[in-house]
């Protein structure tokens, strides 16, 4: 193949990658826009479902990387703990727990107490599971890798819910002009624009491949 043909094929490949990234961004942002800005019950459910989906994908990826590095972990226990943690925070902050179980109005302090309680139970569950693990791997590595996945993925994703539901918590001053949906939308737009901008600029003038074949 001649050099011009090779260069043309390379440019087509870059254009195809950029088109796929742009298309996925448009689809994702359309769903996120509706979830964050439409309001109502459907909006709350959509945001919760998206965050939980990210949570499950993130946990699977995290524990997959731990496995690739041949480190011990309780994958399914960690996945269960992460889903329970984020799910409980969603039910509490969305007001569904208060509606179903007659609890007090949601607050950030209450969410923090809930997280601490769930993490404490999760830690006990890991220690109990470790007792029955045969052959027994190092306790610190096994327990630490499992807990780290929940903290790094699920606990941090919980802050998305705290921002989104902040206006419904008891700490929010009456009449405060704060909309968690718009704040999250701003963060997402900045992140995606930075990602696409960096990719486009690197493709046009970059000299060194970040991930060479």
Predicted regions mapped to residue ranges:
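Membrane-embedded alpha-helical bundles of polytopic integral membrane proteins
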Residues: 2-213
């Amino acid at each position: 193949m001649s050099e011009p043909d090779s260069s043309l094929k390379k440019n087509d490949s870059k254009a195809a990658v950029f088109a796929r990234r742009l298309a996925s961004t448009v689809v994702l942002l359309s769903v996120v826009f509706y979830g964050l800005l439409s309001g109502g019950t459907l909006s709350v459910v959509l945001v919760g479902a998206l965050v939980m989906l990210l949570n499950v994908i993130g946990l699977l990826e995290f524990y997959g990387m731990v496995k690739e590095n041949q480190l011990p972990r309780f994958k399914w226990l960690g996945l269960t703990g992460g889903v329970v943690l984020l799910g409980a925070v969603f039910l509490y902050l969305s007001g569904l727990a208060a509606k179903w179980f007659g609890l007090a109005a949601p607050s950030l302090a209450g969410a923090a107490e809930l997280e601490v309680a769930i993490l404490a139970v999760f830690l006990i569950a890991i220690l109990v599971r470790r007792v029955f693990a045969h052959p027994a791997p190092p306790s610190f590595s096994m327990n630490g890798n499992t807990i780290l996945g929940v903290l790094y993925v699920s606990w941090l994703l919980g802050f998305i819910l705290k921002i989104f539901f902040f206006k419904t918590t008891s700490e929010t001053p009456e009449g405060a002009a704060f909309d968690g949906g718009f704040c999250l939308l701003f963060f997402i737009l900045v992140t995606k624009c930075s990602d696409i901008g960096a990719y486009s600029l690197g493709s046009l003038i970059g000299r060194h491949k970040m991930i060479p074949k």
